[in-house]
Amino acid sequence: MKYSTIPACLALAAATAALPAFAAGSMPSPIVPDSVTSHSIVLHGNRYGYTARAGLIALRDANDKQTTTMFYTAYTLDGADSRSRPVTFFYNGGPGSATIWLRMGSFGPVRVVVGNAAMTPPAPYKLVDNQYSLLDTSDLVFVDMAASGYGRILPGADAKKIFGSDNDVHAFAQFIERYLKRFNRWQSPKFLFGESYGTPRSAMLVDYLQNNGIGINGVVLQSSILNDGLASTDTYGGASTDDWQYIFALPTEAATAWYFKAVPSAPSSLADYVNQVRTFAMGEYRNDLAQGANLPPAEFDKIVAALHRYTGISETYIRNANLRIDGSRFLAEFRRNQGKTQGAYDGRYWLYTVDRESPTPQLEATDASIDAAYIASQNTYFHDVLKYETPLLYLTGAYQAIQQTGEWNFKHRGELPLNTAADLQEAMTYNPNLRVFSANGYYDSVTPWLATIYTLGHLELEKPLQDHISYGFYPAGHMIYLNPVALAQFHDDLERWYHSTLNVR
């Protein structure tokens, strides 16, 4: 999951810091033997045997000294030819997040059952075979970033050379290369699957790998943020006077209003409605905001009425906000009078409001619903099913380790704000067979879908290469897989995309 929506903090940082048992630390012998177990799963009416491996891969520096370990779980189909069998590497974002969310919620062989747009009931939690797994299409490797999961920075290593956008890419590249070597997967079709900050990681990573002789067949970008300069926050470079953030946020805000039936005479189709709002946002709204203080009063009033109609926010609030309502303010204001605050990761989720006077949310509703279920279920799964034995605690994030080194260095190639669109452009140009799938949730205020399609539509690719980007839009939020209906649609779209990509010659 997880990308920051609150200025001056990293996603989940506050939650992680509140749990002292999750503190970054070292153990005398953090590297333990892999666990290897056998399982089976029924997909599309067919039973498949598969092998699950949980373990660590140690990274080394230029002097061949071990610096850190990265934890992973890999699921490989029994009896398949590894020379032709695809392999997909999954990772979450943060930066700092472990890959618990994708591992336990998306396309692996098991899935945690959580509340869909509702609070998950308390323990015991339910873990089921995942009928939406992609294991019949690809082998699956879920990778936790350095110093998260069961991975640790090893004694004597310089953490500042491990954290940061460029260092992080080098770590993932080395992990992938060592995995390919260890399991002789060099001939396998290779895919990258990143969520949230995992999407700029993917853009940098695919470019880096290909420029170092490791070809990639396809990249899945779920809930993208390739250009921080277009983000709906001023934390990493988008100035608060930059109107793009309000334009990109509007269709997402409208989707949440549609979901809660706050839109009079709205179309029954969510897709039709948000595309109607998109046309307004990129047209009349964009043009009027560009006029700034020169916008005529009559036109100002017209936009006030339109924003009220699309979002359900009061005209008084819209006037006071000077027509500009970013995602955080919308989430706090939308049902303020009911004492409710919407979730940034998924606007369908809500919590009772802590402070009705606060301009932005104090708590994240999506986290409140799912975090305990995911953490408990994964720990049980590792112990009872994968039989992975270690003295270490599983770290849901590397945030404390990062904080001990200062801050995450977002500079990429010496530049800020972080903008990895050029990396993806270069990767798609260098490898004209590369295919990209962009997955987006309509209710995601963290990485608004309109910002994503704007970014991907401005890579300045030649048209034949631009056509290699496919899109999926789903009735869900940042973590598309939280909605089983959206997960089923996402699975089917990806299955078709994989098959199409694997037929590229």
Regions found by a protein language model. Give the residues of each.
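Gram-negative bacterial Sec-dependent N-terminal signal peptides
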Residues: 1-22
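Catalytic histidine-centered segment of alpha/beta-hydrolase-like enzymes
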Residues: 475-486
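N-terminal cap/lid subdomain of alpha/beta-hydrolase-fold enzymes
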Residues: 24, 64-161, 457
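Alpha/beta-hydrolase active-site loop
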Residues: 134-138, 145, 162-180
